[in-house]
Design a protein with these regions (language model features):
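Conserved Nudix-box catalytic region and its N-terminal flanking loop in Nudix hydrolases
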Residues: 16-51, 55
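Nudix hydrolase/Nudix homology domain
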Residues: 91-127
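A short beta-loop-beta micro-motif enriched in histidine and acidic residues
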Residues: 5, 27, 73, 94-95, ...
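Conserved N-terminal beta-strand and adjoining loop/helix that marks the start
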Residues: 1-17
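Conserved positions in beta-strands of structured domains
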Residues: 11, 64-68
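Short secondary-structure junctions
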Residues: 56-62
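Short, charged/polar surface micro-motifs in flexible loops or helix N-caps
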Residues: 11-16, 25, 40, 73, ...
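Active-site-adjacent beta-strand/loop module that shapes the phosphate/pyrophosphate-binding cleft
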Residues: 60, 68-90, 99-103, 122
Length: 127
């Protein structure tokens, strides 16, 4: 049975996307992903995402809507469009680097496999 993971698709006012590079101590080291994590038992997906972003990035978000859900290997990744409600994050407990990336440059990053379906939906709308 796949492990459910939630992720936040966050854009800044210039339209750049928040991308996070996995630390070399994590599975899929040095791959890029949208920030998020695993829900706790009985926790709503949206609540889990708010909690994970606060824990990992010390940032506050509002979850707006589900964007994509796909199962890749052992991961059931549920991506939500989110909005920052405070300052932009600058550090992460789970990532070695944070970067605000323009849409045109997203495909240049080396992405973790579970994030690829959501990335494709961003780059090729209506697919």
């Amino acid at each position: 049975m796949p492990i459910t993971v939630v992720a936040a698709i966050i854009q800044d006012q210039a339209g750049n996307y928040l991308c996070c590079k996995r630390g070399d101590w994590k599975a899929s080291p040095n791959k890029w992903e949208f920030p998020g994590g695993k829900p706790e038992a009985g926790e709503a997906l949206e609540s889990a995402l708010v909690r994970e972003i606060k824990e990992e990035l010390s940032a506050e978000i509002t979850v707006l809507r589900q964007f994509d859900r796909s199962i890749t290997g052992e991961i059931d990744l549920v991506c939500f469009v989110c909005e920052l409600t405070g300052p932009k994050p600058t550090t992460s407990t789970d990532h070695s680097e944070l970067r605000w990336v323009p849409e045109a440059e997203l495909s240049k990053l080396d992405w973790a496999e579970p994030d690829l379906p959501a990335l494709k939906r961003i780059l090729i709308p209506f697919c």
